[in-house]
């Protein structure tokens, strides 16, 4: 009898172990190959405007059966794989992919470089599909906006009183609609845009949107070719073009002494320096010239032959349409 009882207890113990093992296996399967995986980006709202030429990452999460939201890891992907899908705005995105970083998965979005005047709505999704048959068992949507911020409406009101419109580097775009507003404020007269170091006076009647992003980065090919000269650079990489000829005035008070009062102005375009006729105002310590197109301007204290090539790599390249990639800043 005792032997029978012992055998019975042993069988019960084995049965209990089998049940527990089965239960643990079932839990693992539920995590890795549930018919509906609840993928998400957590609390991400995608409210941030994505700037061109930058990379952004968004961690991926999964909601477990107990309602707990945890980072997506390899443990959740035993029987499924992750893929991405772009729906709208593909032209504004260079890459849209899922990467693993520190054992967790995240969506990595790299935007196309450039200087657009309009913002592009981008729609994409991250999907979980079964490895066995490709069936979609979960997805998370990403709605993004790519572009540059527009100048504030408050800044435009300066034109009402004939004052300068200040262009912030963080908000460089002026839209077609905003130009119409500016023109109305100015009664069709010229208006002046400035950043404090430069100012540009021009009529804007019927003007389409422009990107007035600017910088003072050196053109290394020029500086290295003429090492014994002083240089000042003022660049508008978006190559904003205006319908009317305007006057660009650049403050050179900081350079007046080093340059000895001598200023020669050039436009850098496709590896070549093109001479621009400019006027020096010694009293105001400014340099002015007429132009419809804002590009990459080079100021130096010694004359350089007009048409001098400083970057040979452009010589054999075909012409590029301005709307696809402004020539003002191609080599950066």
Regions found by a protein language model. Give the residues of each.
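Solvent-exposed, low-complexity, repeat-rich "mucin-like" stalks and linkers
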Residues: 24-84, 164-172
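Low-complexity "stalk/linker" and mucin-like segments enriched in Ser/Thr/Pro/Ala/Gly
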Residues: 73-103
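Extracellular/luminal low-complexity segments enriched in Ser/Thr/Pro
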Residues: 98-119
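A short beta-strand micro-motif common to beta-rich folds, especially ectodomain repeats
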Residues: 115-136
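Intrinsically disordered, low-complexity repeat and linker tracts
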Residues: 149-195, 201, 293-295, 300-332
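Proteolytic-maturation and junctional protease-sensitive modules
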Residues: 241-298, 303-304
